[in-house]
Design a protein with these regions (language model features):
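Acyltransferase
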Residues: 1-136, 140-142, 147-150, 154-159
Length: 161
């Protein structure tokens, strides 16, 4: 079983599922004209229906947690956009564990909401690269170190001047 786990940007998908099936799907993708296939070193079939047991465990934990109303839009990658009336935070977080990540749609939704700057915090610059491939008008900053934070602060001060 193989599913698309991530729709990262116009030029990149991530598949996940049973290891042998994912390997075979990668071979078939190359035969069909994919430019490259990069096996990811991950510990599970994240963002697929194979994660349903984890989603159920998460749902059980959420039964004892009170969630309030959101005071600003919150976007969920499992739907590629903001939470809507009738949807609940626990429901969407459970979905996020066991369904595809629609990052490209989420980036486009942010652009549609007027977002013009995104700060990526953590190791690597992959998310910033996906933003640049999806919405060229959005500025990105990748922050990994204290020095990066200082550079970000200076850059943002310069934009406000």
């Amino acid at each position: 079983m193989v599913e698309i786990a991530n729709y990262n940007c116009p030029t990149q998908l991530v598949i996940a599922g049973d290891a042998a099936a994912v390997e075979k799907a990668g071979e078939l993708a190359l035969q069909a004209g994919a430019k490259r296939v990069v096996p990811l070193k991950v510990s599970g079939p994240f963002h697929t229906s194979l994660m349903a047991p984890a989603g159920e465990a998460l749902a059980e934990k959420f039964r004892s947690v009170a969630f309030g109303e959101m005071s600003f839009p919150v976007l969920f990658n499992c739907k590629g956009g903001p939470m809507e009336a009738g949807e609940t935070i626990p429901e969407l977080l459970v979905r996020q564990v066991q369904s595809s990540v629609y990052l490209e749609d989420t980036i486009r939704a942010m652009a549609g909401m007027g977002v013009d700057t995104i700060v990526e915090i953590g190791p690597g610059k992959a998310l910033s690269a996906f933003v640049k491939k999806t919405e060229k008008g959005i500025k990105t900053y990748a922050v990994e170190t204290v020095e990066d934070i200082e550079k970000l602060c200076e850059a943002l001060k310069g934009e406000q001047a």
